[in-house]
């Protein structure tokens, strides 16, 4: 029944062929997050919660987009998208427990608010850096496409987030690869307090789609029917014809960035203008005017939702404070796996270091049909060092993928593939270039298992090292950037045998692995290597020489410098330990050796301050001090960038100082 008094609404609605039931469902779906927020704001004022990021005024976007997706399609929301979580029907007690840091949440108290993810509800939570999740959406969509699943992925960002380089990279990759992603921009006028006029110069953000050859649509983000109808139509089309689509939703944030910051920077008349466009009150008036929503039904919705909120809040408040031990926390940093050992067979062939890596890659590709290789120039060209030469012909372009120069987003793609249960290897053309992808490695891959029990089954190959006259941007050995980041594993083999076996182990491991390959060893070191597929466990150093007078602990090229230098000390009895993996580190073998010899020299190609060598030295002093007959000595490169000229590079590297340093230790 229509009301006697005509109601006003400031949004033009077109219900089309939508049923009354669908219209009421959309209204109720928007009402639920609004009422939850109303309650949260009360609790905030009462001091019962510490912080709240409001999405009031933006409910139509989260609810409309989520309602247009199928339940098994992934969605990557932001911190204002409460409607995504409620529309996916996450039980409220679990949501409230999550916000309270309780055990019935999704992250064991390790993540707050909306940063968590859940495979059960196909939601992948954001990280505070905003941009990386765009690349992750690309990866999920790529997995759908490779598996020939007619599914789409939706990812949210704000107009402020579009200023990040990750936004460009993710859109670029999605357009080049025709990935079925809906890039949803919530343009709410302000990035915290920065207005759009100071954020970008284009008139509309959808104009950016032109540069990527990408279909783009601008949608009234406060009009639930426009959001739901248009996104439903686009989603259905993209499922049949995979491609990325850029969506700009025009809306407004009616509360502060978070409640403490307020909205004083917003002109009062602007707040008043957008208040008249409230998505819920306008839609309510429309439904009432159309005779679809009665006062009784509306009251019923309110009462049901409020009762659900209060009941589940009480459950969350009554839940005990989460209990965890140091062991519990440490055990969840990495995905626990049972190492699978594959024995090498007697048949061997002499391989260069580079060929052993290539052979390991090839055999792993044959073993794991869901393994995807990605990197610049790795397909037809075979990679900068020709390690993947011939792979394209054997495994096809779907699995051996040239990438744009978009390191950050490609690492995000690898993460997305892992979320879909696939494996990924990313080749950095040079390890120096990993700086362009540093953020997703240390903030996404490294933390995701600890945050919500989602492994990052990703290997990043890192051609590294000096001694090849490549200068400051193609010669770094930057393993220490990653060994100090919990959640990452770091491998650094010195020999062909180890390189192949450890690479196979890295690919089997569901945790993120940085696999360092020294360029100077690629074609200079040869060794007999088993022809079959085999693995070598992480965390086990190799004792290359056994002695009683001095311990030399090193890895990578340092192993070969030590072997060469020891030829000048034929009478010296030396323990030479090749670490092989730096995270996990074989501290047991280090301590056994040092306690036996009483003297230790640690060699690293890195400069010393903050290096792996420095950490090993500290561990030795803490655990073996009473066994030492001399200070634990370290030898590393100069504290300068890496020079290009041959004589300067030789001066920079520690190799030419090794003889003198060893004498110093012997004579102490």
Residue ranges and their predicted role:
Residues 1-61, 68-69, 249, 255, ...:
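Conserved acidic/glycine
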Residues 35-38, 42-177, 195-201, 206, ...:
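Cofactor-binding active-site loop characterized by glycine-rich and histidine/acidic residues
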Residues 38, 103-118, 205-206, 380-394, ...:
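Acidic-glycine-rich active-site phosphate/pyrophosphate-binding loop
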Residues 42-48, 113-127, 151-154, 189, ...:
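Glycine/charged-rich beta-loop-alpha catalytic/anionic-binding loops adjacent to active sites
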Residues 51-58, 79-80, 116-134, 158, ...:
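Active-site nucleophile and cofactor-binding loops and adjacent substrate-binding regions
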Residues 63-71, 140-149, 171-179, 210-211, ...:
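Alpha-helix C-terminal capping segments
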Residues 101-107, 175-185, 399-402, 446-462:
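A glycine-rich helix N-cap at a beta->alpha junction
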Residues 122-311, 318, 483-598, 602-603:
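Glycine-rich ThDP/TPP pyrophosphate-binding loop and its adjacent helix/strand module
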């Amino acid at each position: 029944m229509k009301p006697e008094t005509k109601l006003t609404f400031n949004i033009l609605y077109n219900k089309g062929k939508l049923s009354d039931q669908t219209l009421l469902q959309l209204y109720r779906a928007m009402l639920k997050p609004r009422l939850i927020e109303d309650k949260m704001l009360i609790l905030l004022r009462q001091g019962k919660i510490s912080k709240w990021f409001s999405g009031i005024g933006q409910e139509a976007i989260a609810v409309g987009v989520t309602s247009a997706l199928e339940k098994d399609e992934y969605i990557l929301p932001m911190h204002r998208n409460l409607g995504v979580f409620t529309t996916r029907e996450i039980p409220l007690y679990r949501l409230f427990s999550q916000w309270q840091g309780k055990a019935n949440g999704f992250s064991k108290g390790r993540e707050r608010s909306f940063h968590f993810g859940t495979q059960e509800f196909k939601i992948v939570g954001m990280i505070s850096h905003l941009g990386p999740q765009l690349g992750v959406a690309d990866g999920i969509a790529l997995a759908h496409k490779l598996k020939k699943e007619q599914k789409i992925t939706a990812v949210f960002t704000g107009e402020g987030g579009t200023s990040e380089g990750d936004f460009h990279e993710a859109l670029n990759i999605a357009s080049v690869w025709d990935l079925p992603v809906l890039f949803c921009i919530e343009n709410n006028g302000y990035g915290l307090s920065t207005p759009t006029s100071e954020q970008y110069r284009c008139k509309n953000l959808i104009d950016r789609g032109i540069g990527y050859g990408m279909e783009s649509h601008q949608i009234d983000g406060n009009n639930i029917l426009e959001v739901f109808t248009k996104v439903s139509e686009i989603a259905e089309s993209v499922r049949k014809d995979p491609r990325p689509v850029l969506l700009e939703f025009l809306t407004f944030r009616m509360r502060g960035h978070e409640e403490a910051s307020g909205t004083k920077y917003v002109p009062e008349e602007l707040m008043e203008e957008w208040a008249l466009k409230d998505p819920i009150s306008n839609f309510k008036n429309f439904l009432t005017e159309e005779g679809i929503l009665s006062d009784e039904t509306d009251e019923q919705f309110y009462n049901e939702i409020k009762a659900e909120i209060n009941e589940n809040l009480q459950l969350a408040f009554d839940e005990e404070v989460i209990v965890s031990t140091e062991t519990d926390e440490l055990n969840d940093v990495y995905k626990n796996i049972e190492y699978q050992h594959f024995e090498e067979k007697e048949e061997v062939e002499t391989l260069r270091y580079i060929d052993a890596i290539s052979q390991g890659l090839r055999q792993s590709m044959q073993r794991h049909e869901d393994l995807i290789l990605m990197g610049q120039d790795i397909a037809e060209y075979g990679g900068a060092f020709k390690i993947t030469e011939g792979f394209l012909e054997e495994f096809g372009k779907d699995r051996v993928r040239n990438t744009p120069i978009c390191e950050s987003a490609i690492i995000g793609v690898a993460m997305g593939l892992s979320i879909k249960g696939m494996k990924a290897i990313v080749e950095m053309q040079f390890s120096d270039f990993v700086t362009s992808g540093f953020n997703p490695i240390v903030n996404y891959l490294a933390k995701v298992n600890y945050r919500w029990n989602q492994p990052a089954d990703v290997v990043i190959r890192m051609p590294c090292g000096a001694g090849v006259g490549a200068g400051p941007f193609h010669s770094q050995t930057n393993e220490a950037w990653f060994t100090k980041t919990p959640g990452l594993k770091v491998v650094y083999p010195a020999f062909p045998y180890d390189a192949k076996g450890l690479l196979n182990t890295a690919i089997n491991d569901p945790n993120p692995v940085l696999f360092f390959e020294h360029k100077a060893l690629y074609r200079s070191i040869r060794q007999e290597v088993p022809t079959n597929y085999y693995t070598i466990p992480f965390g086990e150093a190799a004792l290359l020489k056994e002695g009683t007078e001095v311990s030399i602990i090193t890895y990578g090229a340092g192993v070969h410098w030590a072997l060469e230098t020891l030829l000048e000390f034929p009478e010296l009895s030396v323990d030479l330990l090749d670490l092989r993996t730096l995270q996990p580190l074989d501290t047991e073998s280090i301590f056994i050796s040092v306690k036996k010899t009483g003297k230790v020299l640690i060699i690293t190609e890195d400069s010393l301050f903050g290096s792996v060598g420095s950490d090993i030295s500290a561990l030795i002093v803490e655990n073996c001090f009473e066994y030492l007959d001399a200070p634990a000595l370290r030898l590393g490169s100069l504290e300068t960038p890496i020079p290009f000229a041959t004589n300067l590079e030789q001066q920079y590297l520690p190799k030419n100082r090794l003889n003198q340093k060893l004498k110093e230790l012997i004579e102490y």
